[in-house]
Swiss-Prot record:
It comes from Synechococcus sp. (strain JA-2-3B'a(2-13)) (Cyanobacteria bacterium Yellowstone B-Prime). The gene is rpsI. Belongs to the universal ribosomal protein uS9 family. GO terms for molecular function: RNA binding; structural constituent of ribosome. The keyword Electron transport does not apply. This is Small ribosomal subunit protein uS9.
Length: 136
């Protein structure tokens, strides 16, 4: 047995938000973020807030320059995908070391946001908007 077999090199985490799904791989590295084969800042349209939210779980644990983040994301929009990636990174960090779970849970990084678009109902114009009521 080699040392590599006892210490895994790749950690997986899945995150979801609205209709976005992100499969996140954490690989020991220098802190690069690659989303769908593109640099993270380019994929997230150079929005610093989104990049910061993706890096959030790593920064809480002081590991921002210890792992490369490799992501396959689909569905939803840029914001939904960024939140899905954030959850996936947090779940992967829990795989790295179960002791990471406590600080991530306190900061709320392990919560899956359940809000999604409500379906349209028949007889209504939208999910809750009804046609104008006429008494006579």
């Amino acid at each position: 047995m080699t040392q590599a077999s006892s210490q895994r090199a790749v950690y997986w985490g899945t995150g979801r938000r609205k209709t976005a799904v992100a499969r996140v791989r954490l690989v020991p590295g220098t802190g690069k973020i690659i989303i769908n084969d593109r640099p993270g800042d380019q994929y997230l349209q150079y929005q610093e807030a989104l990049l910061a939210s993706v890096k959030g779980p790593l920064e809480i644990l002081g590991l921002e320059n210890s792992y490369d983040i490799l992501v396959r994301a689909h569905g939803g929009g840029v914001h939904g995908q960024a939140d899905a990636i954030k959850l996936g990174v947090a779940r992967a960090l829990c795989e790295v070391d179960p002791a990471n779970r406590g600080p991530l849970k306190v900061e709320g990084y392990l919560k899956r946001d359940p809000r999604a678009v409500e379906r349209k109902k028949y007889g209504l114009r939208k999910a809750r908007k009804a046609p104008q009521y006429s008494k006579r």
